[in-house]
């Protein structure tokens, strides 16, 4: 600023000329530059140790003549969410914002959304310069997820109808997406197939019904899925559901067959649960009804119903005394249920196989549930 004195003269009210010397004044037109720096553009104050606070730096090129300063957090509507009055105006200062708004409950976090930082300094010459930061995102929530299964009923048996399942994944978040994973599980919630990636998923996944080891899904089984996405602040969301599998008629050598592990009997009994008001009964009814529909397309074939069991002890005694009679009786029960639904009993016979034809070793505790099944062999 440049000091200066002034003098003024002129007549007073009575017409007398008077002279007045003005006090010293300062003309201050120096520029007042302010700057804001941010250590990140996204803050996620949810206590997970990742991006929990925003470090804001202020730079004041001229501090002499500065009377006061204030930092403000501004939301997308222009409202001030948080004020940080600064007692002293320093050339460089650092403020941490952990997402808390002004108010009587500072433990709360401001709503997720887009904010800006505003820094203003008031000088004794009346100047009030203001610096505004680029936009920042406050994000404490995981992404909003959706799954749309396309091509149901899913029947990957190479008949040209619904052999591939389309899986449309949607991810909505105010932050960018860091990674995602879509897992398909078996009934014991062990990994069956997995898709994953970085960034947002593509518009649609295609699944051929096989596991990561090439194993085909089982008829009438419901495969759980788990969809997880993580945004770039570490917020994660997961949703779950099921992929229903249709009745599959697959070729095994020179034979066509249907293999089902999801026809459920009472424990150690050939009695089928057929109460429509129970989940097990409703599932059994749906499977049997669907079998009749499928076999109607193969009218030139006879059907052999085979019962299979798990030999837990691995002994001949269990095989002969328990499993052979039980698997035979269960096959007969299924045959009767098909006849009740309109199938010609003359084209259906039965065979109890016990534990003689396991899919996996009976000692495989994680997978031997697959051995307890009913197979339908299509014969000409």
Residue ranges and their predicted role:
Residues 1, 80-109, 191-217:
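Glycine-centered tight-turn motifs at strand-turn-strand junctions
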Residues 3-5, 66, 112-116, 177, ...:
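Extracellular Ig-like/FN3 beta-sandwich strand-entry sites
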Residues 8-10, 119-121, 227-229, 378:
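Conserved structural position at the C-terminal beta-strand
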Residues 28-44, 132-181, 193-201, 206, ...:
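Periplasmic peptidoglycan-binding/tethering modules of Gram-negative envelope proteins
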Residues 275, 308-380:
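Periplasmic OmpA-like peptidoglycan-binding domain that tethers envelope proteins to the cell wall
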């Amino acid at each position: 600023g440049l000091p200066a004195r002034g003098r003024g003269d002129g007549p007073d009210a009575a017409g007398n000329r008077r002279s007045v010397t003005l006090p010293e004044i300062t003309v201050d037109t120096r520029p007042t530059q302010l700057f804001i720096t941010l250590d990140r553009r996204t803050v996620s104050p949810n206590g997970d140790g990742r991006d929990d606070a925003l470090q804001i730096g202020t730079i004041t090129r001229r501090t002499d003549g500065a009377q006061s300063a204030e930092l403000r957090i501004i939301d997308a509507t222009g409202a001030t969410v948080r004020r940080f009055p600064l007692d002293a105006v320093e050339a460089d200062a650092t403020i941490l914002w952990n997402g808390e708004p002004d108010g009587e409950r500072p433990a709360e976090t401001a709503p997720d959304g887009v904010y800006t930082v505003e820094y203003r300094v008031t000088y004794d010459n009346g100047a009030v310069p203001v610096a505004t930061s680029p936009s920042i995102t406050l994000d404490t929530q995981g992404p909003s997820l959706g799954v749309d299964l396309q091509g149901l009923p899913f029947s990957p048996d190479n008949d040209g109808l619904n052999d591939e399942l389309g899986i449309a994944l949607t991810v909505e978040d105010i932050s960018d997406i860091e990674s995602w994973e879509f897992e398909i599980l078996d009934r014991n919630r062990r990994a069956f197939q997995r898709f994953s990636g970085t960034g947002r998923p593509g518009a649609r996944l295609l699944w051929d019904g096989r596991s990561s080891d090439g194993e085909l899904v089982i008829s009438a089984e419901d495969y759980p899925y788990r969809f997880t996405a993580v945004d770039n602040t570490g917020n994660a969301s997961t949703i779950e559901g099921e992929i229903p599998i249709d009745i599959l008629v697959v070729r095994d050598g020179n034979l066509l067959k249907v293999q089902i592990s999801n026809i459920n009997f009472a424990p150690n009994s050939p009695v089928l649960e057929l109460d429509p008001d129970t989940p097990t009964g409703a599932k059994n009814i749906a499977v049997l009804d669907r079998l009749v529909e499928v076999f109607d397309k193969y009218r030139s074939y006879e059907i052999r119903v085979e019962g299979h069991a798990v030999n837990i002890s691995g002994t001949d005694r269990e095989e002969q005394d328990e499993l052979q009679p039980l698997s035979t009786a269960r096959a007969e029960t299924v045959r009767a249920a098909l006849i009740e639904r309109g199938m010609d009993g003359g084209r259906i016979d039965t065979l109890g196989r016990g534990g003689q034809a396991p899919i996996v070793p009976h000692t495989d505790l994680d997978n031997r549930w697959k051995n307890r099944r009913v197979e339908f062999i299509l014969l000409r």
